[in-house]
Each structure stands twice: as C-alpha cells, then as structure tokens.
C-alpha cells in the first residue's frame, strides 16, 4: 500500500478536463491547504470552511474515494 498524502495524489489529477481536475487546480492554488493530511474529516472540513472552493463537495467525495483506491496499488 502506498503512503502518500491526499495532496500528493491530487497533484496527479491536475490537468484533467473534468471537475476533479478543476478541484485539483483549486487545491494547488490554495497555499494553506493541509498538504500532509490524509484524514477525510480534516480535509473535508478544510474545504467546507476555508478557501474559495467553487465545486460541490460531491466532487471532493469522489476524488477522495479515488484516492483511497489509488493507495491500494
């Protein structure tokens, strides 16, 4: 199993031409994003309460689920 933070995974998603790619760009642009965390609750709370994230939380939920699958391989 891989040992990468959510932020490290998100950097692999940048450049996609979909909502997940746009969220990855917003996370990249947010200098205060918790780059070393991988806990769903910490990350979702941050996205809900900080920064100027414009996409629905369902995009984050889907991206986090993809992250957990990515960690397995």
From Swiss-Prot:
Domain of life the protein comes from: Bacteria
InterPro entries according to UniProt: UPF0346, YozE_SAM-like, YozE_SAM-like_sf
Family: Belongs to the UPF0346 family.
Name the UniProt record assigns to this protein: UPF0346 protein MW1311
């Amino acid at each position: 199993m891989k040992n990468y933070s959510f932020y490290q995974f998100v950097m692999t998603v940048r450049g996609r031409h979909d909502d997940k790619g746009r969220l990855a760009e917003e996370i990249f642009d947010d200098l205060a994003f918790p780059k070393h965390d991988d806990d769903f609750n910490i990350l979702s709370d941050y996205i809900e309460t900080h920064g100027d994230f414009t996409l629905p939380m369902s995009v984050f939920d889907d991206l986090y689920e993809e992250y957990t699958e990515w960690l397995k391989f």
